[in-house]
């Protein structure tokens, strides 16, 4: 499915039935057209019992399908934070900090500062930047109900 919510739901259903490869293929195809956090979550958790490092490896593969998209960087960084791979998380976000800073990217940087260095001051600086950063892109339906 080309529709993001449909692809995410299909991926989750297929994964829950043990059809991980089919779920991954659907999510990858949709991600290549339009990266979205719901797709990243469905992809990361497609295999039950994966470690945080396994999920990081999976998300890295997904992110490399659209390496210059902020959603790829955010998904990769989030998985890296969960795996406590803070240098990887910083690397994933670096291309977006100066030119495409979004609220989520700044919040992820704040999480890194707190988790890696327990630096509340730097985390607050990132949260302040998040307040004035560009809004994150969101999926919306056209029309009215």
Task: List where the protein language model places each region.
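Intrinsically disordered, acidic/Ser/Pro-rich low-complexity regions proximal to membranes
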Residues: 1, 14-17
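"A position-specific structural signal for the A-helix of alpha-solenoid helical repeats
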Residues: 8-9, 42, 75, 104-112
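Solenoidal tandem-repeat scaffolds enriched in leucines and small polar residues
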Residues: 1-4, 9
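Alpha-helical linker/edge segments of TPR/alpha-solenoid repeat scaffolds
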Residues: 46-62, 86, 115-127, 133-140, ...
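TPR/TPR-like (Sel1-like) alpha-helical repeat modules
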Residues: 20-38, 97-103, 114-138
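Start-of-helix register in tetratricopeptide repeats
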Residues: 5, 38, 71, 104-105
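Alpha-helical adaptor scaffolds
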Residues: 25-98
């Amino acid at each position: 499915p080309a529709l993001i919510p449909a692809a995410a739901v299909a991926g989750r259903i297929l994964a829950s039935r043990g059809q991980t490869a089919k779920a991954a293929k659907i999510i990858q195809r949709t991600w290549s057209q339009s990266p979205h956090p719901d797709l990243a979550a469905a992809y990361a958790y497609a295999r039950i019992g994966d470690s945080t490092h396994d999920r990081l490896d999976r998300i890295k593969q997904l992110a490399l399908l659209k390496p210059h998209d902020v959603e790829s960087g955010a998904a990769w960084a989030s998985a890296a934070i969960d795996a406590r791979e803070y240098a990887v998380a910083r690397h994933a976000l670096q291309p977006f900090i100066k030119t495409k800073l979004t609220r989520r990217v700044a919040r992820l940087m704040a999480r890194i500062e707190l988790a890696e260095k327990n630096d509340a001051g730097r985390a607050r600086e990132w949260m302040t930047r998040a307040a004035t950063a560009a809004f994150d892109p969101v999926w919306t339906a056209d029309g009215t109900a």
